[in-house]
Amino acid sequence: MLEISARLEEALNRAFIKVFPQEDRSSKTSSILTGSNLVPASKPEFGDFQINCALSLAKEIKQPPREIAQKIANQLQKDNDFVRMCNPPRIAGPGFINLSINSKTLISEIHVRLNDKRLGVPLKKFSTDKIEEGKSNNRVILDFSSPNIAKEMHVGHLRSTIIGDSLARILEFRGYEVLRLNHVGDWGTQFGMLITHLKEVVPEVLHTKDVVEISDLVNFYRQAKKRFDEDQIFQNKSRSEVVNLQAGDKESLIAWQLLCNQSRKEFQKIYDRLDIKLTERGESFYNKFLVDVINDLKNKKLLINDQGAQCIFLDGLVGKNGKPQPIIIQKSDGGFNYATTDLAAIKYRLTIPPHGDGACRLIYVTDAGQASHFSGVFQIAKLANWIPTDCQIEHVPFGLVQGEDGKKLKTRSGETIRLVDLLDEAIQRAKNDLKNRLNTERRSENENFIDKVSTTVGIASIKYADLSQNRISNYQFSFDKMLSLQGNTAPYLLYALVRIAGISRKGGDLNVSSHNIQFNESQEWELIRKLLQLDYIIAEVEKELLPNRLCGYLFELSQTFNRFYDQVPILKASEPSRASRLILCSITADTLKLGMSLLGIPTLERM
């Protein structure tokens, strides 16, 4: 109801001008009247919107709040556009004004959605004021997933990957130009260590494709790390290898590239299963910019030499000992670290093309444990004046994935769970559930159907279980809960869609014009009002970057539809009620499909 809300805001502002003339307003009164005074109703029985400013105004202008509310309501009743949209305002409690959209307007909105693939969700309008040439107000960079080369993706990568993907989809749908970046860990001391170890143990890995699996690389990495920690000679060799790599030694670069490619292939298998689209741009991409970052910070007198290291001390940043804690930008041996690379990335991403990406909004999706790191890096970028006033840069943190015991999710042996194993188990459990249900229902389906449904349900359940949680919180992972057909789960939503698809197949083609759509039952109006909330919810997710708000809406919509389905005849109703109710079924299905696609969740016609 974004458009209706905007028109009501305009009508309300016109009423304010009449009831509270500009010349009679105090600064406090003006502040109240120019605030956000129209809000969605807190409960369905209060209507669609509420105006709550009378109580605040009462203290300022010394009048009873109900009297103020009545004056505003009376003036709204004189506004032609308001009267066309709304039933007469109702005063409630100490001075709340409750507004209900009239049936004619609701039916008109439903009819518009019949022919609108966007289902009433407008494209965002972007200002072009004060934008440098080459920049765009709608260009967003989403940094998410970001696994490390030579390591397998684990359950910890799941949240960043699917939260980042869903936010990218929602922002793209709203009209943003989104660059999805995979900032993989493809550089650093660990490569010198790994290459040195592989040269001695399995040298063929470093010049031949596909000799080892990613799981083998992980084991080799563990062996190399153990040697690095215990053997000074090996440690020195590893550091020399890093120097060779940084200097562009041909043999070292070939070995490094083979390791990256092998990992990249394994990552892509996961991304394909999850339907994730990403542009890889690893840490190594920014190597050529690191010296410029140091020089720029030096020229701006932000760096302090601390025992040979180049550091920045930020206000309020102290260590456990209570002393100021430095952020090291360049180590005493001349090397760089994560902070340096992240600063180079910020600078490049905000610089106009062809020397950068020209983005106006940067979003980093990582675990909450990195909040302090990003806070420091963002502060340094601001001090260096790399972030224009019209640009946003934000960290989107998320909590841990826990087991049902409330502890960090691990295997029985205490190992971190591989993401591929998690997906495989979800699909296998979904397949077992499906086969049991088919046996109970005495249904016969071929293996292709069983494989497709179990894969879709398994992947959808994993994604939805995560996205339906407030990302800021830790959440407890449970296969039983996420695969259940009851509650706020992917199978519940998928089943609602399958149910609607069955009704639509029996209902036949729809051919209904606006003048003969007719609704009479309370369940119909409840469903209509819920359907018309989609645009508001998506705008809210765009602003707050909380995908669980969309999940909550889709669950409530499914519940509302199921009540409508259970309590109101559809296929057996007489015309025009039959066609009108089939229209509601169709728009509900379209809304669920759109919402789930924005979450990156696949759907089914049959289960």
Swiss-Prot record:
Keywords tagged on the record: Aminoacyl-tRNA synthetase, ATP-binding, Cytoplasm, Ligase, Nucleotide-binding, Protein biosynthesis
Organism: Prochlorococcus marinus (strain NATL2A)
Any single biological process term in GO: arginyl-tRNA aminoacylation
GO cellular component: cytoplasm
Any coiled-coil regions, as ranges: none
One matching Pfam family: DALR_1
Superkingdom classification of source: Bacteria
Listed NCBIfam families: argS
HAMAP family named among the record's database cross-references: Arg_tRNA_synth
Gene Ontology MF, one: arginine-tRNA ligase activity
EC number: 6.1.1.19
Family of the protein in this entry: Belongs to the class-I aminoacyl-tRNA synthetase family.
Keyword Cytoplasm on entry: yes
InterPro entries, A to Z: aa-tRNA-synth_I_CS, Arg-tRNA-ligase, Arg-tRNA-synth_N, Arg-tRNA-synth_N_sf, ArgRS_core, DALR_anticod-bd, Rossmann-like_a/b/a_fold, tRNAsynth_Ia_anticodon-bd
Motif ('HIGH' region): 147-157
Chemical reaction(s) catalysed: tRNA(Arg) + L-arginine + ATP = L-arginyl-tRNA(Arg) + AMP + diphosphate
Localisation: Cytoplasm
Protein name as it appears in the record: Arginine--tRNA ligase
UniProt keyword ATP-binding present: yes
Subunit relationships: Monomer.
